[in-house]
Design a protein with these regions (language model features):
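Nucleotidyltransferase catalytic core that binds NTPs
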Residues: 1-232
Length: 232
């Protein structure tokens, strides 16, 4: 069953109306927050962030807090793909604990529809750079056509990425193409601690090397508590 297509890529799924069911779930999650009257009344923007949070760092918290302060509601999508360091469910719980004081933030899982192996199957293609750009366009088409349209999203926030060429290219595609659909993209300079950008990969390396003091400097207390428990 077709989900979305660009000039070069067609995404199919094996479940009829799978994307429609996902949209319904997002709308139900949104309605729960809206009914509680938790909006930021100082803004008319509806924002979105898509993040991995493996783990949830002070850098992620900085980006979410910044975006939430500038939006009526902020939709925060956490990648659903299972990863080696922290499971999808644990990452979602970690983020939920880390942003629970930000009442206008609405948490969602990405399922297979945003930044997933389904949307970025570049290992099937010989021309990796060209393939990645094609997959970016597919990801943007799904976000624009379904998610932004159904949730009324007007702005997408991304963090700057000084060390990763892949993320830089993804951000470039977002900034080039989303405004064509009336969706503003704002890139926020990454939080620095001791003149170094806060990085989830650095947190993972510190954790695996049992450098828990470094971990504590780079993550919120809620994340640190979770990681400390895992060390026991």
């Amino acid at each position: 069953y077709p989900v979305a297509e660009t000039d070069h890529v067609l995404l199919l799924e094996n479940e009829r109306d799978g994307i429609k069911k996902y949209m319904k779930k997002l709308q139900e999650e949104t309605k729960m927050t809206e009914e509680n009257g938790m909006e930021n009344k100082e803004s008319d923007e509806i924002g979105a962030i898509v993040a991995n949070c493996n783990p949830f760092t002070k850098g992620h918290r900085y980006l979410v807090e910044y975006a939430a302060s500038r939006c009526r509601y902020l939709h925060l999508f956490i990648l659903s793909e299972e990863q080696e360091f922290i499971s999808s469910d644990a990452r979602f719980h970690m983020v939920s604990e880390g942003v629970k004081d930000l009442k206008n933030v609405i948490l969602h899982r990405t399922s297979d529809y945003l930044i997933s192996p389904v949307v970025f199957p570049t290992y099937f293609m010989k021309e990796k750079d060209q393939a990645f750009t094609m997959n970016c366009m597919l990801d943007i088409e799904i976000f624009r056509r379904y998610i932004a349209k159904n949730l009324g999203i007007t702005k997408r926030f991304v963090g700057s990425e000084p060390n990763c060429q892949v993320t830089n290219e993804y951000n470039r595609c977002l900034k080039e193409y989303l405004p064509q659909s009336g969706i503003e993209v704002e890139e926020i300079k990454r939080l620095e601690i001791d003149d170094m950008p806060v990085s989830a990969s650095d947190v993972r390396r510190a954790y695996e090397g049992s450098r828990m003091e470094d971990v504590k400097r780079w993550v919120p207390e809620t994340t640190y508590q979770y990681l400390s428990e895992c060390k026991k």
